[in-house]
Structures are given as C-alpha cells and as structure tokens.
Amino acid sequence: MSVIDTNQIDLAAPRISEAGVADYVALLKPRVMSLVVFTALVGMLLAPGDFHPVLAVTAMLCIAVGGGAAGALNMWYENDIDALMTRTANRPIPRGRVTRPEALTFGMTLSFFSVVTLGVLVNWIAAALLAFTIFFYVVIYTMWLKRSTAQNIVIGGAAGALPPVVAWAAVTGSLAVEPLLLFAIIFFWTPPHFWALALFRNDDYARAGVPMLPVVAGPDHTRLQILLYTIVLVAVAAAPWPLGYFDAVYGIASLALGGWMLVLAIRVYRHRSGSAALRATRNLFKFSILYLFALFSILLIEVVAKAVWQLFA
C-alpha cells in the first residue's frame, strides 16, 4: 500500500495570503497618496473655468486611486528591496500579508479603472497624463532608474510632480504655464527631500543595493547636491511672483519658507559627522515635508479667499 506524503502536498499548495483591508490600504502608500491628492487639489482649484462638483470629485478620486495603484505596483516590483531595508521591511508583501500576484492584480486593476474612468467621465487628456504618470513611476523609475543610476530620484521625481498637471488638465482639457510651475516646484523639491532621507538611511540603501547618491558618490557630495538643489528650489518657487502668476502673499511666504529650508540645507552641508550631522539631515527631511504642504496651502487659501470675496462682492 502506498503512503501519501502530506508534507509534499502542503508544500505544493498555493499560498493563500492573510491580507486584510489595512494591508491593501498600505499597498497604496497612503502618506504619499496624501501628497498626490493635496498637490492635485491645488492644481485643480487654480485652473480657470467652471467645473461641476461631481466631475471634480470624480477627477480627484481617479488621481488618488491612480497614485495609489502606482504605489502598489512599486511594492510588487520592489519586494526584494523592501525585505532588506529596515524602513520598508514591515510592508505587506515582505511580511507575507499580501502575495506578489495579489499586489500586481490589485495595482493593475486600479490603474486601469482610474485611467478609464477619468477618460470617460472627465476628459482623455487628463486620463492620458494620469496613465503616463503611472507608467513613468512604475516602469521608468521603479523598474529602471532606481536600480541603475544615482540620479534615480532626480529623473524619477517627474512622476511625483505630475498630479497638479493632471488635475489642471481635468478642468481645462489643456495645459498652461501655471501647472508647469507647480510641476517645477515639486520636481526641484524632490532631490533635497529624498537625499536627506537617504543620508540617514544610507546603510539601509547600501544593504539593499540601491544606488542612491550617498551610496554611490558619498555623503559629502550628497550634501553639496542638497545645497545646490535647495538654492534652485527657492528660486523656482519664488519665480511665479515676479512673473505675475501668483501674488505677493505667495511670493513673500515662498521666500520665508525657502529661506529657512536653505538654512537647514546649509547646516546639512556644514555638519558632516556625528550627532550634529544626523540631527541636521533629519531636520531638513522633516521640514521639507512641511515646506511643500505650507507652500501649496498658501495657494489653496488664496484661491478660496478670492472665491469667497467674489461671492460677497
């Protein structure tokens, strides 16, 4: 009589994940999604013309879901890197809460429906821009740039800068200078923000084999690049004021916020070792988040204030 080896049966059986709603939400990278939604909202409210509230909500949901889908596909592809890094080891796939096929299906499904819904219900120019954003982040940045060049963040930052452009196009069906200015601000903000993170997570990236700038070129060169990009960022962020696109309130606030960020970048450049260096990089990283939210909040407040003024004028 033959004996059935139950161990072999168990090993051959497909693994069923224990994923819950929270795990799928985590795949969407909620913190990154919040930045996507916020910058897109500013781009939408700055756009001229009337936009039906239902279409506005639809467009924002599509942009949010598309951004989350890109995050899920990023986690699907980078599960090997995530498992090696302390910062990302608790993500759903490395923990075994979600399988790679499940994450891929989830990301692809959300990508498809977000783009198609935006195209059918709003307009196809915005949908094409959203599709390009997802493609750029997943294929160009995640699959190619991140593992091949120290300039991964610089070039790949274009994906994170596109949401306000998508939102503007959702309203107008076209492009203009204003959304491109918002794009430029986020684009030049990205390197100082992520390189500050990379400086105090250098060992993590080195262990995972990710060629971030501190790993490839060293911390000192990274500090110099942070300073240079911060100088460019301050200039780019202030430029819409003298160019006549945003008013003096924004201009003065951008100079004040940019001035403090520049001070923090100088401290990162000057302090190169010990606890002072770690504190400087952490402070810059934390403030850079506040900087972008504050800058875009000022634009948001101005738009709302003008709308209220016109309503009661």
From Swiss-Prot:
Instruction: Tell me what else is known.
Output: Carbon 2 of the heme B porphyrin ring is defined according to the Fischer nomenclature.
Q: Which reactions fall under this protein's catalytic activity?
A: heme b + (2E,6E)-farnesyl diphosphate + H2O = Fe(II)-heme o + diphosphate
HAMAP family from the xrefs? CyoE_CtaB
Q: Which Pfam families match?
A: UbiA
Database matches in InterPro entries:
Protohaem_IX_farnesylTrfase, UbiA_prenyltransferase, UbiA_prenylTrfase_CS, UbiA_sf
Any keyword Repeat?
no
Enzyme class per UniProt? transferase
Q: Which GO terms describe its biological process?
A: heme O biosynthetic process
Spell out where the chain crosses the membrane: 32-52, 53-73, 120-140, 153-173, 180-200, 226-246, 248-268, 284-304
CDD domains named among the record's database cross-references: PT_UbiA_Cox10 (cd13957)
Family membership, please give it.
Belongs to the UbiA prenyltransferase family. Protoheme IX farnesyltransferase subfamily.
Could you tell me what this protein is called?
Protoheme IX farnesyltransferase
Q: In which pathway does it act?
A: Porphyrin-containing compound metabolism; heme O biosynthesis; heme O from protoheme: step 1/1
Role summary: Converts heme B (protoheme IX) to heme O by substitution of the vinyl group on carbon 2 of heme B porphyrin ring with a hydroxyethyl farnesyl side group.
Keyword Hydrolase attached = no
Q: Which key words tag this protein in UniProt?
A: Cell inner membrane, Cell membrane, Heme biosynthesis, Membrane, Transferase, Transmembrane, Transmembrane helix
What cellular component terms from Gene Ontology apply here?
A: plasma membrane
Its topology with respect to the membrane?
Multi-pass membrane protein
